[in-house]
Design a protein with these regions (language model features):
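Functional cores that coordinate and move charged inorganic groups
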Residues: 154-159, 166, 170-249, 253, ...
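Bacterial N-terminal signal peptides
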Residues: 9-17
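Active-site proximal loops enriched in glycine and acidic residues that flank catalytic Cys/His/Asp
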Residues: 279-283, 288, 300, 324-337, ...
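Bacterial N-terminal signal peptides that target proteins for export
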Residues: 1-9
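Structural motif
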Residues: 34, 161-162, 206-208, 276-280, ...
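Active-site His/acidic residue clusters
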Residues: 131-136, 212-222, 229-247, 260-264, ...
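N-terminal catalytic scaffold of extracellular/periplasmic and nuclease hydrolases
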Residues: 22-172, 176-198, 202-203, 304, ...
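Phosphate/oxyanion-binding active-site loops and adjacent basic polyanion-contact surfaces
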Residues: 142, 252-260, 299-303, 380
Length: 389
């Protein structure tokens, strides 16, 4: 009799648990901030954490996972294929951008968000036509088709975008002025940083000089790349001579955090349907290609300032998810034995190209628990889509 009573009680508890699970609602996610560190592996994150005296944004209680970064045809992805995986949830061949291995157009998470009535935005410290941002709106079989990519940008439907690359929009072989096209489509177009900062427009594109979006290091080294890999713009920027070393060291770059804050302000205005904002720090990759320890740490410091600002935003907006990851790792970066006495970790690099090592995933805010464990790069946009539907 006692055994029967216990069995009945256990079954009753099971019924209640099952019923409860059946009525559980998924976390409500209205807004998504997608922060991508191009080339940012665990070595880059470690270099930041060990260099700082106070807690970084990476240490502010995120849900942590790891992501495989393979492309469709190689263990080591390039930026076009890596960006495509993070944007569309589909792996493609190296060199391909926004299309599958057969060259068919893919639909990015930004496009899907637009179909749901959400606003969308892009902020990058490189050109708007570079591989990662382009993966969210374009479809081409080569990243070198920058004029085609710029033309596709005019059809992207994003509400706000800030980056560089004006030549791709106006100094074109087809003689088109794509800034005029954007204006015809209802955008305000700004070509200076001051105008971007001071605008109250609800729909704008800022196409700025490269010097405004990135203060780069002065040296004469040529960016290196592994055999078979083309030298990316980020590596060229990281090795260019736009500013002196003294300028770079004395004036921390604030572009990414200020441009991100501006985009958040625009996307949040009178917006009940939510938004997705993609932000990329592209130059981490460049310093990895150049095996430049000092530059990598400084770029990670800018990334962290932006990250901490975004964490503050989601803490004030509880229906917002922040996902931080990388398209791949660059440089084979690790922490060396030397440097402890000086309080500055010494980095060691194993390559001047990309590697196929797993990259970190940090998630904060609403729905963050979905991003724990080991996952594929394609899982990340799929998880985001599931949470916002």
């Amino acid at each position: 009799m006692k055994k029967n009573v216990l069995t009945s009680a256990a079954m009753l508890v099971l019924v209640f648990i099952t019923a409860g699970c059946g009525t559980m609602r998924k976390t409500e996610v209205n807004n998504v901030i997608y922060l991508i560190g191009d080339g940012m592996g665990l070595g880059a994150v470690s270099s930041l954490i060990l260099s700082e005296n106070s807690a970084t944004g990476f240490e502010q209680d995120p849900v942590i996972g790891l992501s495989e970064t393979c492309s469709a045809n190689n263990y080591v992805t390039d930026s076009p294929a890596g960006g495509t995986a993070l944007a569309t949830g589909t792996r493609t061949n190296n060199g391909y951008l926004g299309v599958d291995p057969e060259g068919r157009q893919l639909t990015s998470i930004l496009r899907k968000a637009q179909d749901m009535g959400k606003k969308t935005g892009i902020v990058v410290n490189t050109t708007l036509t570079e591989a990662t941002p382009a993966a969210f709106y374009a479809g081409v079989t080569s990243r070198k088709k920058t004029f085609d990519i710029a033309k596709q940008f005019t059809e992207s439907g994003v509400d706000v975008a800030v980056g560089a690359g004006l030549d791709h929009f106006i100094n074109r072989p087809d003689s088109l002025d794509l800034t005029a096209t954007l204006i015809e489509k209802g955008y305000d177009v700004y070509l200076s940083w001051e105008k971007v900062l001071n605008t109250d427009s609800d729909k704008f594109v800022g196409i700025l000089p490269l010097a405004d979006v990135h203060r780069s290091k002065s040296d004469n080294e040529t960016a290196g790349a592994a055999e078979g890999q083309e030298v990316c713009l980020a590596a060229q920027l990281a090795a260019s001579a736009e500013d002196t070393d003294a300028t770079r060291l004395s004036e921390p770059t604030v572009y990414l955090e200020k441009a991100s804050a501006k985009a958040l302000d625009v996307l949040s205005r009178d917006n009940k349907d939510g938004f997705i904002l993609m932000i990329e720090s592209a130059i981490i990759d460049g310093y990895g290609h150049n095996n430049d320890q000092e530059g990598m740490v400084e770029e990670m410091q800018e990334f962290d300032r932006t990250l901490r600002q975004l964490i503050a935003y989601i803490n004030e907006h509880p229906k917002t998810l922040l996902v931080v990851t990388a398209d791949h790792e660059t440089g084979g970066t690790g922490i060396n034995y030397t440097g402890y006495e000086s309080g500055k970790p010494s980095l060691i690099f194993s390559t001047k190209g990309h590697t196929g090592t797993l990259v970190p995933v940090f998630a904060y805010g609403a729905g963050a628990e979905a991003f724990s464990g080991i996952m594929k790069n394609t899982d990340i946009p799929e998880k985001i889509e599931e949470l916002i539907r």
